[in-house]
Amino acid sequence: MTELFIDGAWRDGAGPVFASRNPGTGEPVWEGAGASADDVERAVASARRAFAAWSALDLDARCAIVKRFAALLVERKEALATMIGRETGKPLWEARTEVASMAAKVDVSIAAYHERTGERRSPTADGVAVLRHRPHGVVAVFGPYNFPGHLPNGHIVPALIAGNTVVFKPSELAPGVARATVEIWRDAGLPAGVLNLVQGEKDTGVALANHRQIDGLFFTGSSDTGTLLHRQFGGRPEIVLALEMGGNNPLVVADVEDIDAAVHHAIQSAFLSAGQRCTCARRILVPRGAFGDRFLERFADVASRITADVYDADPQPFMGAVISARAASRLVAAQAKLLELGAAPIIEMRQRDPALGFVNASILDVTPVRELPDEEHFGPLAQIVRYTDLDDAIARANDTAFGLSAGLLADDETVWNTFRRTIRAGIVNWNRPTNGASSAAPFGGAGRSGNHRPSAYYAADYCAYPMASVESAQLQMPANLSPGLHF
C-alpha cells in the first residue's frame, strides 16, 4: 500500500509491514509498509526543499491554508471520528469531540502566533528596534495514540503557521488516523513537501530522531521515551526539543457538601478515555474519617457500573477499550504489583478477553503501601491514598517527579488558595476534573512531565525563534563619536 506521504505524493514504504487493529473487536484497520531509513531521508530532504518557499509565503496565505484544513475537518468530522474510534477503541461520542477540538485549535494557534510571536517595533533615539520571529526549518513531529488526530496537530498547526516544514511520525498504533488527517491537509492545498508522513515502528522513529538535517523535534508521548530523546539531544543545543509527557497526577478530595458532584469529577478525572489521558488522575487523595468513607463507598458504587463497549455501540458507553490487548495486560500486571506491595482492592481490574483491550474501571487503596512506585499507569486504574489534613494531602500530592496536572475538590476557597500556592503542577484545577484544560491556556507540566507548552496557546513559543534588530532607514554618521575615534 502507498502509505507514506512524501513530496506531495503517496508512496510505498520500504520498511517492514505492520498493522493496526480495533482493540475492541480485533478486526484489522490498517496495514502497510513502514518507512525505511532511506524513506526518512527522502522525507526530510523534501521538507528541506519546501522550506524556503513555504517560509517566504505571506503569513495570511499560510493561515488561509490552515483555516481551510479546519473547515475540511468540520466537513469530514464523522468520517475522521469513525477512523479514530475504530483504531483507538474510544467511543464515537469522544472521537467526535477530538475532531471538533482539532478544528477549534486552529483559530487559537493563529491568535497565539500574532500575540506571542509576530512582529513588534519600538522607536529608539537613532532608529527603531524591531522584534521578528523566524521559523526553525524542518521539524519532526512525533504523535501519540491516545489522541492521534488532536495532539499531533497541536504541534503541526503552529509549526506550519510559523513557516516550518514538517516530517510527521505518528504512533504505530494509529497509522490510519494519521493517513486520514494528512489527506485532509493535502486537500486543503498544502504545497508539496511542507508536510511529510513517515509511518513505521521504532526503527522509523529512531531514523527520524537521529537525522542530522532536522532543526527541531516536537514530541507527545510517554515520559520514558521523552527522557530518552532528551538524553539523545544532550550536547546539541541547535535542536529545539519540545516534550509533552505523562504524569502521576493527584486529585485531592476535601470534605464537600455535594458528594455526588465530587464523585462525578473523580470518575471523570480517573476514567475518562479509559484513563488514557496524560492528565487523568492516577492518585485520588481522600480524607480519613466518616466523610472519606462515604465518598469511597459512592465512588466505588458508580465506578462499578461504568460500561465499556465497542466504539460504535448503541447506546454509547462511557469507556471503550484501551489501545491494545497488550496494554490491557500491562495494566493488570501493574495492579498485581501494587497488590503484592500491600494495596487493598476495592474494585479489581480484569481483562475481559486476552485478545482484546477491554478492562474495567478499577480502584485500589494504596495507603498501606510503604514505598508507592512513582509511575504512570496509562489506563483506568485509580489509586486511593487516605490523608489526615491538608498539609498531609499536599505533601503526598507533591511526592512525585512528575508535575502535569492536579486538582482539588473543596467548598472552602481558603483551602483552594493554599492548594494552588503549594502544589507543583502545570495544570491545577479547582472543582473541575484534572483532565479539563482550556484551549486558550498553556498545556503542559513541570518535572518529568516535560518542557514547553504544546497543543495550544504557548505552542507558538517553540515554533519560531526571536530575531532582534536595530534599524535605521538612512546610513549616517552619529552626532557624537566614541572617545578615541577621529575622522
Swiss-Prot record:
UniProt keyword Hydrolase present: no
Gene: astD
HAMAP family reported for this sequence: Aldedh_AstD
InterPro entries: Ald_DH/histidinol_DH (IPR016161), Ald_DH_C (IPR016163), Ald_DH_CS_CYS (IPR016160), Ald_DH_CS_GLU (IPR029510), Ald_DH_N (IPR016162), Aldehyde_DH_dom (IPR015590), SuccinylGlu_semiald_DH_AstD (IPR017649)
Keywords: Arginine metabolism, NAD, Oxidoreductase
The organism's taxonomic lineage, starting at the top: Bacteria, Pseudomonadati, Pseudomonadota, Betaproteobacteria, Burkholderiales
Pathway assignment: Amino-acid degradation; L-arginine degradation via AST pathway; L-glutamate and succinate from L-arginine: step 4/5
Catalytic site: E244, C278
Reactions accelerated catalytically: N-succinyl-L-glutamate 5-semialdehyde + NAD(+) + H2O = N-succinyl-L-glutamate + NADH + 2 H(+)
MF annotations from Gene Ontology: succinylglutamate-semialdehyde dehydrogenase activity
CDD domains: ALDH_SGSD_AstD
Protein name as it appears in the record: N-succinylglutamate 5-semialdehyde dehydrogenase
Record has tRNA-binding as a keyword: no
GO BP, sorted A to Z: arginine catabolic process to glutamate; arginine catabolic process to succinate
Enzyme Commission code(s) on record: 1.2.1.71
Family, per entry: Belongs to the aldehyde dehydrogenase family. AstD subfamily.
Role description: Catalyzes the NAD-dependent reduction of succinylglutamate semialdehyde into succinylglutamate.
Binding site for NAD(+): G221, S222, S223, D224, T225, G226
